[in-house]
């Protein structure tokens, strides 16, 4: 079975979608074998709105490809179009039962998101979206996905207009598009409910899953992640990160993480540390997505702790259960906090202006981060250390 998945654009969102991707990989065989409900039987586009799935209200759009060259078949001529009527004429015992290993997934999306899923065992290959640089973006996107060949099913974890064009161009028998909802559920739950509804699943594992092996460090690591791609409002101050690192410089090996666009703030931290006699390793702009995951996963194995803003690396840490101090300011931590990481501690203030959800502080004061002191973070790190020691003992 061959599946196309359009990944979320942002690294953090892609990590949060990993549980839903696992559900697709694991249960696609049953989907191919005809375990569809009558919801999918018509040969036209569907739109299901405001369906309640537990605590989550999710909207899902399902598109049916009526391109003539599909000849009424299910997907890439790999099986019958199993509508409700067709199922009545099929003997279930004759339906092909594919294993998870036979499912091949083509991942489509941003460079960072694609790099994250390169190591997935069901990955056939990844395709980086190159349409943004094209003069006629929609036309380029349509033909880029059109030329990928035929698929049994296509899933999009994005809800933009361009994702609709992508699904329209995809040569797939069944197409499923995620739609945003305004409920307060965690983003992991939203993605998972989308897939559970699409595949008619009652249950699915909600654990995040990445396939990079954690690095083995020779000493406990204090990882600092001062960046946040969304905007400056989410960033704790470089001087604050440096103060925390100086407090623990004799206990941990200090490593600074960041992307190429975050070199300046990482270098500020490095400069403060070296001026105060503390050694550190600045990895800003020097690691691939794979190496980033391996290093963050290795921090927990080393007995270390990861201090981070609300960001993609924070979600990577959650996937590896790395002990984490997560610093929140303008965003809703209930929707994007470290998922299922019992080793994480969320630090935030309770100001009237929170959460503003802005990229830059609209008041110009940035009190949600400015008033979150380094001493508070140091105290929480020590508590987390004691908790980890008690659990291991």
Predicted regions located by residue number:
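Catalytic machinery of carbohydrate-active enzymes
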Residues: 1-52, 58-393
């Amino acid at each position: 079975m061959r599946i196309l998945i359009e990944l979320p654009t942002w690294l953090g969102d892609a990590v949060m979608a990993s549980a839903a991707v696992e559900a697709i990989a694991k249960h696609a065989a049953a989907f191919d074998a005809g375990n569809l409900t009558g919801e999918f039987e018509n040969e036209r586009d569907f739109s299901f709105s405001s369906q309640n799935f537990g605590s989550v209200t999710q909207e899902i759009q399902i598109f049916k490809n009526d391109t003539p060259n599909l000849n009424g078949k299910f997907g890439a001529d790999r099986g019958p179009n199993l509508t409700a009527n067709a199922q009545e004429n099929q003997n279930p015992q004759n339906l092909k039962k594919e294993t998870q290993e036979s499912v091949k997934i083509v991942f489509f999306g941003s460079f960072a998101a694609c790099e994250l899923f390169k190591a997935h065992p069901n990955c056939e290959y990844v395709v980086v979206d190159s349409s943004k640089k094209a003069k006629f973006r929609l036309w380029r996107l349509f033909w880029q996905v059109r030329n990928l060949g035929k698929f049994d099913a296509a899933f999009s974890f994005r809800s933009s207009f361009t994702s609709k064009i992508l699904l329209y161009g995809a040569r797939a028998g069944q197409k499923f598009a995620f739609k945003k909802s305004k409920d307060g559920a965690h983003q992991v739950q939203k993605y998972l409910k989308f897939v559970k509804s699409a595949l008619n699943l009652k249950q699915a594992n909600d654990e995040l899953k990445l396939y990079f092996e954690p690095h083995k460090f020779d000493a406990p690591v204090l990882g600092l992640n001062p960046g946040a791609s969304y905007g400056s409002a989410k960033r704790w101050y470089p001087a604050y990160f440096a103060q925390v690192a100086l407090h623990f410089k004799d206990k941990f090996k200090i490593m600074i993480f960041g992307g190429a666009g975050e070199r300046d703030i990482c270098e500020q931290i490095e400069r403060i540390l070296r001026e105060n006699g503390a050694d550190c390793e600045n990895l800003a702009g020097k690691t691939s997505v794979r190496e980033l995951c391996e290093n963050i996963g290795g921090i927990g194995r080393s007995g270390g702790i990861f201090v981070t803003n609300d960001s993609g690396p924070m979600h990577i840490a959650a996937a590896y259960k790395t002990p984490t101090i997560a610093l929140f300011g303008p965003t809703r931590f209930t929707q994007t906090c470290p998922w299922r990481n019992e080793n994480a501690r969320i630090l935030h203030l309770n100001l009237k202006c929170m959460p503003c959800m802005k990229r830059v502080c609209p008041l110009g004061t940035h009190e949600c981060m400015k008033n979150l002191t380094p001493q508070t973070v140091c105290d929480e790190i020590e508590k987390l250390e004691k908790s980890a020691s008690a659990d291991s003992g």
